[in-house]
Amino acid sequence: MSVLVITGTDTGVGKTVATAALACAARVAGIDVAVCKPVQTGTGPAGGTGDDDLVEIGRLAGVDALHPGWRYPDPLAPVAAAERAGAALPTRDELIGMIRAADAPGRLTLVEGAGGLLVELGQDAVTLRDVATELAAPVLVVVAPGLGTLNHTALTLESLAAQQVPCAGLVIGAWPAQPGAAEIDNRDALARLAPVRAALPAGVGSVSPVDFERISATAFDPNWLAGLL
């Protein structure tokens, strides 16, 4: 299996845009790529206009192999969203099964989590870290550039190391057009914690798909991309 799990140090750090950028870069590089979103909250009522991260990823990245999982209307943590919907969370076996079903020989399968690494995604308090552990998959961590990011990032990396889950590196999800001293210093400090694979421009998720492809295609080291397979 060639599965890469993508998490974030916090909500709103740019995880979905980073997933789309990586999927786009892989596609441009000629890699067969699929994207899974096992658990999505905030989808709104049926037929409404709630969040749909996979639709946004497909629009930006030009990727068709999109695999949705369990969806809940309220924009809450999965446990709370499932409770409010009167619905069950998936079991560990169901989570693992959907990801394995999406994967294929020669394919890179990206798995975007919901929230951070230790957010409960499934029954019996199953987290994204548990999923990565069972799949023996590395984890790419999307981070913020501003104050507080060093502590948040270090805690996430420490949590991965505690279960011997390899970190595939960091992506800065929204690099400002005019970074201040904090952002510049933090970028250097983040690189000492783990390799920074990309620093995506703030607002890149709002550009046209053509511009998104141009930016994404050069955001990641092609040798690193090829090594994900």
From Swiss-Prot:
Mg(2+) binds at T16, D53, E112. ATP binds at G12, V13, G14, K15, T16, V17, D53, E112, G113, A114, G115, P201, A202, G203. Its main location: cytoplasm. Disulfide bonds: none annotated. It catalyses: (7R,8S)-7,8-diammoniononanoate + CO2 + ATP = (4R,5S)-dethiobiotin + ADP + phosphate + 3 H(+). InterPro entries: DTB_synth_BioD (IPR004472), P-loop_NTPase (IPR027417). GO terms for cellular component: cytosol. It is found in: Cytoplasm. Pathway: Cofactor biosynthesis; biotin biosynthesis; biotin from 7,8-diaminononanoate: step 1/2. It comes from the Bacteria. Coiled coil: none annotated. The keyword Metal-binding applies. Catalyzes a mechanistically unusual reaction, the ATP-dependent insertion of CO2 between the N7 and N8 nitrogen atoms of 7,8-diaminopelargonic acid (DAPA, also called 7,8-diammoniononanoate) to form a ureido ring. Homodimer. Belongs to the dethiobiotin synthetase family. This is ATP-dependent dethiobiotin synthetase BioD. The gene is bioD.
